[in-house]
């Protein structure tokens, strides 16, 4: 993605923070003061200050989805990626946010700010079914079951 172009489309009131894949961590994409490289930052710390999360096919979306914040999926090469790498889910129907193919579509999604957060809730129910506040209870039940089978 051309972050300079995206920033130009969004305007000066927007700050773009980016963190590249670890294999690309030494790359600097832009020297613009409102386009900030966060490659050395903890990704999970960035989640809390992020208004919109833009990703491609990264599994990090599963972690970010718990934040219940808008996500945009940049899939400029979706057909090629499906063919060469493969995707285990129905990308166009399951992504909990707009799928965009260029910087203009990404910018328009942000500027319109009309995200359906209920799609994220559906996504989380499917992929985070145990994130329900009852994990400790399940672990205790499992421990008790194991202990009772072992005669403890």
Language model region names:
Residues 29-31, 59-127:
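Catalytic binding pocket for nucleotide-activated donors in carbohydrate/polymer assembly enzymes
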Residues 1-28, 100, 137:
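Conserved catalytic-core segment of nucleotide-activated headgroup transferases in glycan assembly
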Residues 20-62:
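Donor nucleotide-activated moiety binding/catalytic core segment of transferases
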Residues 13-14, 50, 68:
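Short, well-ordered alpha-helix to beta-strand connector turns
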Residues 132-152:
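C-terminal alpha-helical cap of glycosyltransferases
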Residues 17, 36, 52-54, 72, ...:
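Hydrophobic/aromatic beta-strand patches that form the interior of the parallel beta-sheet core
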């Amino acid at each position: 993605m051309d972050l300079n172009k995206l920033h130009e489309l969004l305007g000066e009131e927007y700050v773009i923070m980016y963190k590249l894949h670890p294999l690309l961590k030494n790359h600097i994409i832009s020297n613009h003061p409102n386009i900030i490289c966060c490659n050395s930052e903890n990704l999970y710390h960035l989640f809390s200050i992020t208004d919109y999360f833009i990703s491609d096919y990264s599994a990090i979306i599963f972690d970010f989805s718990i934040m219940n914040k808008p996500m945009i999926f940049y899939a400029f090469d979706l057909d090629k990626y499906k063919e060469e790498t493969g995707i285990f889910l129905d990308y166009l129907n399951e992504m909990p946010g707009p799928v965009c193919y260029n910087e203009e579509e990404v910018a328009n999604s942000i500027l319109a700010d009309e995200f359906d957060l209920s799609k994220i809730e559906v996504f989380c129910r499917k992929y985070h079914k145990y994130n329900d506040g009852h994990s400790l209870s399940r672990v205790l039940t499992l421990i008790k079951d194991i202990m009772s089978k072992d005669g403890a």
